[in-house]
Amino acid sequence: MKKIHLLYAVFALLFTGLTSCEDLLTEEPNSKYDRDRYFDSEDKAEMAVMGIYSSLSDFNHYGWYEMASPASDDTYYTARTQSDNQVHDIAHYQLNSTNTWIESIWKLKYEGIDRANLTIDGICGMTGYAENTRLKALEAEACFLRAFLAFDLVRYWGDVPFKTSYSSSYESAFGERVDREVIYDEIISDLTFAKNNLDWATASSS
């Protein structure tokens, strides 16, 4: 009988130890942020705005090329090499559906807009947003970048899919084409907000 009680005690200690060990070893991941809990400080709001610039600075975006550049007289491509065939096609207005460079530009425009949508939505939901001029300025910066990217889309492709809400799922990432005049109205609205809430640049601005 004593042996049975002893076994029960041993098993109880083992299970307790395993549970405690599991609790001790379970950590919150520090390598990524939870979107729903991310916007809790001005610093994180600024990081979100920097994420929009990260999309803009991609090699295939404004980091190196931009789609209009090869079609300008400043960088007119006359020769063909294996590395610049697709750029050459743009310069000579010989486009087709296999041009992955244009596909990359298309994706990066929407990536930047979606990041701007997430940033604007997150900032607007922050505690004290209504009275915080710093948050308003960060929102204005995101609005300007969204307008800038949307203007690129319209001047390249005319009527395109467009929305001002963040794509929270695969299904919500896609939509029908929107009339360019409607998109222009959104662009003007974003730029007006940016004009009214962004500080003027100074010699100390970075």
Where is each model-derived feature located?
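Membrane-proximal, proline-rich intrinsically disordered regions
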Residues: 21-69, 94-95
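Conserved, well-structured interaction surfaces
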Residues: 46, 54-60, 82-157, 172-185, ...
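Short, compositionally biased low-complexity segments
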Residues: 21-28, 86-89, 158-160
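Primarily recognizes Gram-negative and organellar outer-membrane beta-barrels
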Residues: 3, 34, 72-74, 97-101, ...
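Short edge-strand/loop segments of extracellular domains
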Residues: 166-170
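Bacterial Sec-dependent N-terminal signal peptides
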Residues: 1-30
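Aromatic-glycine hotspot motif
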Residues: 23, 190-191
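Short, surface-exposed recognition loops and adjoining beta-strand edges that mediate ligand/DNA contacts
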Residues: 36, 63-84, 165, 199-206
